[in-house]
Every structure is written in structure tokens, then in C-alpha cells.
A protein has these predicted regions:
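Active-site neighborhoods and metal-handling regions in enzymes and metal-associated proteins
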Residues: 1-122
């Protein structure tokens, strides 16, 4: 819903918000999952389901990413040229603990001005 609202606000998606959400119009720009396991490798292997096929429950010590984002193809005719070729994902890495979770990336910048300021330092 948040991504659809944002894409509508800047004019990339047009039409009735509820209809855009219902038809999953965001998927043109969000063609990936919400995250993945994080471990020994950047995209750690591991099943998202248990042996019965049900969603696997989180256990203390697991680390997952939460990384919503969008990618706007240069080939999309219905999109204004100023948006074409843009891609962004702002990731959080989350450690599952015995009592809940800990956002390992909580001190990293998330707001546009903060990200741009950080980019100027590299």
C-alpha cells in the first residue's frame, strides 16, 4: 500500500488508489520479495517453509533483511523520463532474539537528506 501510494503521489501510477492496490499495479516497479535470510553469505540459503510446507517460524539467532524498494525500467513508455532508470532499496537487517528482534541497521540513514549527506562522505 505504501509503495502504491508513493508511486501515485509522484504521478508514476494513475487512477483510483483502491483499484491500483487491488490490481497490484506496484508490481511493475517492485518485482522482488520483501527480503531474504542473511548469514554466511549476502543472500543466505535456507528454506522459507518447514517440511510440511508451512511458513517457517523465526528462531533466535536468525537474521533477515527487510528491503522494500522500486526499480523503474528505462523501457516503460508510460513513465516520465525523469524517473526512468531509477532503482532504490533501503534495507534493514533484523536479528531475531528470544524476546523479539533487534534492528541491526537502526543507526543507518533512511531519510533522503541523510542518505545524500552520507554519500558525500565517500
Amino acid at each position: 500500500t505504501t509503495i502504491t501510494k508513493g508511486l501515485k503521489k509522484i504521478g508514476i501510477l494513475k487512477g483510483n488508489l483502491n483499484q491500483l492496490i487491488e490490481k497490484e499495479a506496484y508490481k511493475t516497479f517492485y518485482m522482488h520479495g520483501i527480503g531474504h535470510w542473511l548469514g554466511m553469505d549476502v543472500h543466505d540459503v535456507g528454506s522459507y517453509n518447514n517440511k510440511k510446507g508451512d511458513a517457517r517460524e523465526f528462531e533466535p539467532g536468525m537474521v533477515i533483511t527487510v528491503e522494500p524498494g522500486i526499480y523503474i525500467s528505462k523501457k516503460l513508455k508510460q513513465v516520465d523520463n525523469k524517473w526512468k532508470g531509477i532503482g532504490i532499496r533501503i534495507e534493514d537487517d533484523v536479528l531475531v532474539t528470544k524476546n523479539g528482534n533487534e534492528v541491526l541497521s537502526s543507526k543507518l540513514p533512511k531519510e533522503i537528506a541523510d542518505i545524500e549527506a552520507a554519500m558525500l562522505t565517500v
